[in-house]
């Protein structure tokens, strides 16, 4: 396990997240990209295990291996056994084999889901330094590597441990979609020989046309992002309708309960004035059962995904607007 023994001995809170930055070897980045290029198709997600170690306040990810693609009908495949065999093989060849998280590809930034939440909670509950690396192949194909690291916040970890996803539980814990995931800064490290090779390749590469930098990105990206955003907004509206229905039913039941109690009080007062014994006590909670509150965790995840789509659209449009202004300035200077 990659957790520090010192923190456990000192009695520090495991939810303080001592890791402040993540160092990723270039080999890991290339393996993740290669995994998606070989097995990822369109919206299909690829996943794998991250290996490394913790050094002071830095998490060093030094290696990784992919999860093999398998169908639900493949009952003979044991994912846990596969991970143990892979880690045992890496240990035999003297490679870092400590489990420090996992990685996953994303399709147009669609990674905020219940499956990711449950998986990251399992990893982080077992090893507090665990993170998930999200690789976006579409943004990477546009010319800049998009690789981000996330982990669950302490508030969300407590909520997931208690499994209290009711509106009252989330309100008491003050958990909103902004407080679900936190991004950890990462930097990529290469050996000195690789850095020299990259510098040499850069010197030998031919100079590309500078005007290519002003080419606008494909409109399909914006169209698909807006379509996914509208789908999530529709899901959010449906959840809002369900929650409003629950609130109306709860208010109606509370009103009926108060009216019933008032009638009993009036009737008991009349019976007491006539010298008669009061009515027997009844279990009001059995007579007026509260409606089942809809779980709000899915709504928070939808809100987080909507926010993610909005950020992606904002970045996409701001880059294109900047290119338009630069192209206009170049055209006016040349004329």
Swiss-Prot record:
GO terms for cellular component: eukaryotic 43S preinitiation complex; eukaryotic 48S preinitiation complex; eukaryotic translation initiation factor 3 complex. Keywords: Cytoplasm, Initiation factor, Protein biosynthesis. Residues 254-272 have a biased composition (Low complexity). The keyword Cell wall biogenesis/degradation does not apply. It comes from the Eukaryota. It is found in: Cytoplasm. This is Eukaryotic translation initiation factor 3 subunit H-A. It comes from Danio rerio. The lineage of its organism: Eukaryota, Metazoa, Chordata, Craniata, Vertebrata.
């Amino acid at each position: 396990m990659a957790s520090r023994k010192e923190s456990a001995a000192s009695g520090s809170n495991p939810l303080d997240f001592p890791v402040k930055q993540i160092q990723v070897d270039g080999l890991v980045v290339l393996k993740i990209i290669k995994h998606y290029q070989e097995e990822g198709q369109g919206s299909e997600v690829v996943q794998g295990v991250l290996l490394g170690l913790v050094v002071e306040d830095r998490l060093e990810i030094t290696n990784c291996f992919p999860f093999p693609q398998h169908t639900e009908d493949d009952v003979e495949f044991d994912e846990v056994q596969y991970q143990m065999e892979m880690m045992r093989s890496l240990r035999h060849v003297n490679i870092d084999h400590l489990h420090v998280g996992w990685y996953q590809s994303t399709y147009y930034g669609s990674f905020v889901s219940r499956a990711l939440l449950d998986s990251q909670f399992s990893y982080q509950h077992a090893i507090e330094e665990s993170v998930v690396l999200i690789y976006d192949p579409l943004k990477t194909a546009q010319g800049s590597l998009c690789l981000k690291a996330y982990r669950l916040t302490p508030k969300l970890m407590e909520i997931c441990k208690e499994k209290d996803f009711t509106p009252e539980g989330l309100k008491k814990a003050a958990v909103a979609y902004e407080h679900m995931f936190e991004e950890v800064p990462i930097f990529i490290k290469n050996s000195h020989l690789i850095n020299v090779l990259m510098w040499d390749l850069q010197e030998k590469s031919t100079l590309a046309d500078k005007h290519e930098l002003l080419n606008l990105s494909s409109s399909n990206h914006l169209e698909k992002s807006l379509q996914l955003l509208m789908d999530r907004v529709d899901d959010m509206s449906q959840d809002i309708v369900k929650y409003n229905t629950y609130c109306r039913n709860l208010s109606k039941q509370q009103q009926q309960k108060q009216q019933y109690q008032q009638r009993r009080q009036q009737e008991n007062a009349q019976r007491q004035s006539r010298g008669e014994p009061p009515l027997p006590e009844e279990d009001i909670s059995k007579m007026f059962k509260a409606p089942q509150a809809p779980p709000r965790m899915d709504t928070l995840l939808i809100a987080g995904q909507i926010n993610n789509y909005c950020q992606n659209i904002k970045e996409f449009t701001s880059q294109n607007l900047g290119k338009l202004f630069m192209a206009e300035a170049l055209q006016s200077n040349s004329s």
